[in-house]
Amino acid sequence: MRVTQEFYELLRNRINISDVVRQKLALTRKSSNYVGLCPFHQEKTPSFTVSDSKRFFYCFGCKASGDVIKFTSNISGLSYNESAIKLANDYGIEIPKLTVKQKEFYEESDNILNILELANKFFRTQLTPEILNYLNQRNITETTIKEFSIGFSPRNNKFAKFFLDKKIDITTLGQAGLIGKRKNGEIYNLFSNRITIPIRNIYNKIVGFGARVLGNGLPKYLNSYETIVFQKNDTLYGEHKAISSSYKKNRSILVEGYFDVIALHQAGFSEVVASLGTSVTENHLHKLWRACDEIILCLDGDNAGIKASIRTINLALPLVNSEKKISFIRLPSGLDPDDVVNKNGADFFAKLIDKRISLSEMIWYIEYSGKNFKTAEEKANLEKNLKDYCNKISDSNLKASYYRFFKDQIWQNLVIKQKKIITQNFNSSLIASSHCYSELEMLEHAFCALLIKFPIMLAEKDIRDFILNLNFNNKSLEEFRNWYLNEIIDNKVEESEITAIVEKTSFFDIFLLLSKADNLFLDISFNKNNIRLDLLWQWLYKKYYLINLQQEYAISINGNHDFEKVLLYKKEILKIVNELQVLNESFINQTIT
């Protein structure tokens, strides 16, 4: 009795793999998984791991791995299909009968799979010394050639004759994606004069081929045409080998090319797959996330690789969360993974994995690295782009973390590290010449920015008195505060007239810096339209109080031995830090809901 692929997936989703495994061996809970003594080899220390969330088992000892159906097959000696039927009967799951169309589909699928196996056997027999020498120059060993079934499709008519002798016609070869048709109607061997690499699905069945031209012809790589058994948006090269390793290491490495997978696998990185030269799809990501929690993208270090990274980032952002992650390996410019591992060795590539950067760090690298942000327009565009990325994230907690991360990066890289903050169009003087700001000076700027951006807050006498009585470290800002309160706020100058008045004073540069639409000194959130002023004031006030507390604490621990006083300072500091954290969460949650 034949069942559909959809029914296999139904069984994986409906039946907890741990329930099935527990019938054959004792399992002990370990974190989110279960462990026990492997039923497939003798061992004294449990190395057999089962994960209900990933619907997978893996033995660290004998390397046995698979889903609930594969476990049943291995235990019982039944085929995969027979094991699925057994599980369905055991758990009372109805097995749907195949429709006439489904039967025809599976008959055609089986026929295509058989033809592809025959084609691979033919290609394997056509390896010549020239081809083997080429592969050897690429550091591909004889063992690897056999393991990946690398072959060759000659230019002559041997390919067509091979299938004609087996009574397989041109139409059937076309259904298998093995031949092409020219504009003039001529039929030709799709992979003529190319090295062939079989593409296998997760069940180790050949579903298509990739092929590389000998020499410098174009296109360099070809894939089989899509068929009923082969869709590029759902298939990953190397997935049949990588899934168990991905489960073991809790990561998958996603590259672009066949030879990237082969070279990395040969170097010991068996958790590697490739996207068949096409853009990464949502199906690809979900397939890998079922086996692991982290997908590491390792794309070429050129402009095309960066563009591919951006496409994948935009695809992944709505899907990622605190558990399912994307990270990136940044390769040396102009090199692909195959080049890197062959020129620098496995240890070098392992270090690149260790130095991988997170998705948020990759976004910052793409948007910030190698660019100038001298003008307000450039900075505003950067903030807009970062905000657009954040808004694509579905997970609210992760979105909040991204907002915080980018805010911090903007502050660290566009304020503290910049020697000039105001654009070159203005004759910056007092502020722009400073090399960096202390935390206290940052707050002094923020208090002055309040006067400009939220003058309504000064209706609160306590707030006005606090700002008015502050002793600024930056005396230029203090003078600006006094002048602005007296000349603008107290005189109730209309907003439309303020710029013209300030322009005639020595405070114009300061005013320009503080009055920008997205002022960094008040950039607790990216969106100021619905800002809660009470939260903003509490945050600024408590931050100012904390900095002064920390300064007094530093003096107390260095200047005397009043331990009771020191402990009081420490307790108060921790209290304010916690209160600020709560305010941070409130602020960000407000902006993203």
UniProtKB/Swiss-Prot annotation:
Its EC number is 2.7.7.101. One of its GO terms (cellular component) is cytoplasm. Binds 1 zinc ion per monomer. Keywords: DNA replication, DNA-binding, DNA-directed RNA polymerase, Magnesium, Metal-binding, Nucleotidyltransferase, Primosome, Transcription, Transferase, Zinc, Zinc-finger. GO terms for molecular function: DNA binding; DNA-directed RNA polymerase activity; zinc ion binding. Gene3D superfamilies: 3.40.1360.10, DNA primase, catalytic core, N-terminal domain (3.90.980.10), Zinc finger, CHC2-type domain (3.90.580.10). A zinc finger (CHC2-type) spans 38-62. Mg(2+) 1 binds at E256, D300. Mg(2+) 2 binds at D300, D302. CDD domains: TOPRIM_DnaG_primases (cd03364). One of its GO terms (biological process) is DNA replication, synthesis of primer. RNA polymerase that catalyzes the synthesis of short RNA molecules used as primers for DNA polymerase during DNA replication. Belongs to the DnaG primase family. This is DNA primase. The gene is dnaG.
